[in-house]
Amino acid sequence: MRILVDADACPGKHMIEKAASENNVEVIMYCDINHRLESSYSEIKYVESGFQSVDMVIVNEVKKGDIVISQDYGLAALVLGKGAYAINPKGYIYDNDNIDRLLFERHMSGKIRRSGGKTFNPRKRMEEDDKRLYENLIFLIGKAKK
């Protein structure tokens, strides 16, 4: 079991590494070549820049039981289909019970924006998001290790 991170725009990396190091779990952070990441714990993998390039590499490398951290519902749906776990950087767990609704809401929001309407932006990251990410990541690590 590993933690794979869609790290291009992923807040909370310090909490991910904290939870992983406490549980001796490998972390691989994926980003495109236009970003620079540094970590003394995680392996950093750079991929070519391009639309969905990081997502496609993660989908190709994920294995059953891995944990994927991403804000992207589409990526979450794909890795859930491969038997992996998925969580977003604010600590919300994606699962087979909520992913269809999230994808539908994303689709509807896109339609509203394309027709000139307005949708709500996500709220700013708060300390409680780091706490939720850490706690739910610990939960998923325990679940994946069973």
Curated annotation (Swiss-Prot):
InterPro entries: UPF0178 (IPR003791)
Intrachain disulfide bonds: none
HAMAP family in UniProt: UPF0178
Record family assignment: Belongs to the UPF0178 family.
Protein name: UPF0178 protein CTC_02403
Organism: Clostridium tetani (strain Massachusetts / E88)
